[in-house]
């Protein structure tokens, strides 16, 4: 689409991007993000000792982008989606939610609640479907559904990584 992409990575593995910066997210400075139209927070923290970094890093990025026109797009999780129109019940709190993902989903919910308090940043929290399929091909179809859990005609909540990535760029 003609976008210029810069990837910030904390490890030695370099993704397929035009520009790669090897720097831990908490070491990123405001000058590192100068001139960017958008910053995508797709950080993955999975272990009990790193889960709190979801909140810490999103607030760090928010501080860096405060008062700028740069958009902060945050890759969230389905667990924070609401199960009701009154927004009183979230997927992560449902008995059917897989126990092994509950700590991660709770950390991402905390991340969402932390960024909600920031009116000084242009942010969007993008939750994928409940089934987030890495091996599925791009179909060119996805649904933007707000903050409520939705399913397709077959009663499934599913999106491929590829379609989700397109949705993030389209936003």
Task: Please annotate each region the language model reported.
Residues 1-6, 11, 68-72, 79-171:
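Oxidoreductase cofactor-interface core, primarily capturing Rossmann-like NAD(P)-dependent enzymes
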Residues 12-68:
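NAD(P)H-binding glycine-rich loop region in Rossmannoid oxidoreductase-like domains
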Residues 41, 73-75:
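Short beta-strand segments at enzyme active-site cores
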Residues 45-48, 78-82:
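Short, catalytically relevant binding-site loops at active-site mouths
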């Amino acid at each position: 689409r003609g976008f210029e992409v810069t990837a910030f990575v904390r490890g030695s593995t370099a993704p397929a991007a035009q520009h790669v910066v090897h720097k831990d997210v908490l070491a990123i400075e405001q000058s590192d993000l100068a001139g960017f139209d958008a910053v995508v927070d797709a950080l993955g923290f999975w272990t009990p000792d790193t889960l709190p970094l979801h909140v810490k890093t999103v607030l760090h990025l928010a501080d860096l982008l405060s008062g700028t026109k740069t958009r902060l797009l945050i890759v969230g999780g389905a667990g924070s989606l609401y199960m009701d129109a009154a927004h009183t019940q979230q997927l992560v709190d449902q008995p059917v939610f897989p126990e092994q993902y509950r700590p991660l989903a709770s950390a991402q919910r905390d991340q969402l609640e932390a960024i909600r308090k920031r009116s000084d940043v242009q942010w969007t929290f993008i939750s994928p479907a409940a089934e987030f399929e890495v091996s599925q091909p791009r179909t060119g179809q996805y649904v933007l559904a707000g903050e409520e859990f939705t399913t397709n005609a077959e009663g499934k909540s599913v999106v491929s990584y590829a379609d989700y990535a397109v949705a993030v760029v389209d936003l």
